[in-house]
Design a protein with these regions (language model features):
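Short amphipathic alpha-helical segments
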Residues: 19, 199-207, 285, 368
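P-loop NTPase switch/coupling surface
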Residues: 1-180, 274, 279, 330, ...
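Short, surface-exposed charged micro-motifs
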Residues: 2, 104, 226, 361, ...
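Switch/communication elements of ASCE P-loop NTPase nucleotide-binding domains
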Residues: 1-42, 228-355
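Short acidic/polar mixed-charge low-complexity motifs
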Residues: 84-86, 99, 241-244, 395-396
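Hydrophobic, Leu/Ile/Phe/Ala-enriched alpha-helical segments that form helix-helix packing faces
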Residues: 31, 107, 207-218, 222, ...
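RecA-like P-loop NTPase motor core
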Residues: 298-299, 314-421
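Extended helical coiled-coil dimerization/tether regions that scaffold
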Residues: 81, 119, 150-249, 254, ...
Length: 421
């Protein structure tokens, strides 16, 4: 299942405090509430149901989801594409073609509570659920009218992932910026490894496959999930031919990648959003993570069908478009833009390609991030990146690896004419 007209990886750029996180939270609220019932039916049209308790369970203060200056109703609209095989696996069989649903929900504030209404629900542009009437589709066509039971189950299908039989897994998950690896994540990975459920076990396999992309940084080996029965605690380690290295002893960038990949898979959600995946990662590692998302995780068996990323880096672009969020007098607006504009959108300089077929792109960003080609990294002795020092010379600056700089200090112990910056 996926949101129509959006790619597998959708990047949202915009200035700080414009509301990118609120946008992800709005998508989260939509999927969590769309299956809400009123008695044995749905709160359609002018009917409504109080969802304050559900919002609190999700971590929201119900009345604070509205604009505090002008708490007008919130309207969320979407078009969702469904997969026929997934519908069948969920036990949703119908004579009608049900591959697309257009849905509009409304949340409004009333005396300290939040009321939910299903304002519009149309299946494949032929059946209006709110009025419970067929639309004119095409001459000679006589589509079947879906039953009320099917419609209730269909909305539950949008809220919960039916591939997991023994637990309720939400369709949408949000991974915020507080995501350092934890014993809880290690336990989820361990449980996935040992799970009798095929879908769960696949996610552990996808984790191993995704992290194998970082073997040039970690060395030959693989991650293992261990459960210590005496401490009643799970841990992740990286096992080589000579040792098992606990995750907390690995570099902070690797830990961040483990956390992002692990959380992305262990949410078990169909659609996942990640806030600022670039945090604590050098630019080349951001690009590596993007490739892992694109090639090994998103849209493949055992992974989510779509992800949304909010980012201040251009490293995660993987399609022809990105989404720019901007302030306007009428409030924040999101527009689709060509990927060529991404660097400008986040304040990075446009790449300038030196002449020559094999010339590499180099630049210094406005945030002070330096990108150099692989050939220069080899000269520095840092093929996988690392610490560098800058020396000010007359009308120029030299970049050295930490090791090269230490060698200069050993050779010239009395030289203090250069200023380190």
């Amino acid at each position: 299942m996926k949101l129509e007209e959006l790619g597998p990886i959708n990047v949202i750029h915009g200035p700080n405090n414009v509301g990118k996180s609120n946008l992800l939270q709005a998508i989260q609220v939509f999927f969590a509430l769309v299956g809400t019932r009123l008695g044995d039916w749905l709160p359609v049209g002018e009917l409504s149901v109080d969802v304050s308790t559900r919002l609190k369970e999700m971590g929201f203060e119900p009345t604070e989801i509205f604009n505090l200056e002008s708490p007008k109703p919130i309207t969320l609209k979407t078009v969702i594409e469904t997969d026929e095989d997934e519908l069948l696996r969920a036990g949703l069989e119908t004579e009608a073609d049900t591959h697309q649903a257009s849905i509009e929900i409304e949340l409004r504030r009333e005396v300290g509570n939040v009321l939910f209404s299903l304002k519009s629900f149309v299946l494949d542009d032929y059946f209006d659920v709110v009025s419970f009437k067929l639309r004119v589709k095409q001459q000679g066509a006589h589509p079947a009218i879906p039953t009320r039971d099917f419609l209730r189950q269909f909305l539950s299908f949008l809220t919960w992932n039916p591939l997991f039989q023994k637990q309720q897994i939400e369709r949408f998950a949000l991974i915020d910026v507080e995501r350092l690896p934890s014993s809880e994540l290690a336990l989820k990975l361990y449980d996935a490894k040992e799970s009798p459920e095929l879908e769960q076990a696949r996610r552990w396999e996808k984790f191993l496959d995704a992290m194998s992309a970082f073997s040039d940084i970690l060395g030959d080996g693989m991650f293992i999930a261990i459960y210590d029965r005496h401490k009643n605690k799970a841990n992740l380690s990286y096992q080589t031919s000579f040792a098992r290295m606990p995750l907390h002893l690995l570099g902070s960038g690797v830990q961040q990648c483990v956390s992002l990949v692990g959380l992305l898979l262990m949410t078990n959600a169909t659609i996942v959003s990640i806030e600022e995946p670039e945090l604590n990662l050098r630019y080349s590692l951001q690009e590596r993570l993007r490739d892992v998302f694109k090639q090994k995780l998103v849209g493949v068996l055992g992974g989510p069908s779509q992800i949304f990323l909010t980012s201040h880096s251009p490293a995660f672009e993987s399609g022809p478009f990105f989404y720019q969020m901007e302030r306007t007098p009428k409030g924040p607006v999101v527009t689709k833009r060509k990927v060529e504009q991404a660097r400008l959108a986040v304040g990075f300089p446009q790449e300038v390609t030196p002449p020559g077929m094999n010339a590499a792109n180099c630049y210094l960003s406005t945030d002070g991030i330096v990108r150099v080609p692989e050939r220069i990294r080899q000269v520095l002795g840092l093929p996988n990146g690392g610490g560098v020092m800058f020396l000010e010379r007359e009308n120029r600056v030299e970049m050295l690896s930490d090791e090269q700089f230490a060698m200069i200090l050993d050779e010239e112990p009395g030289d203090d004419g250069d200023e380190q910056s």
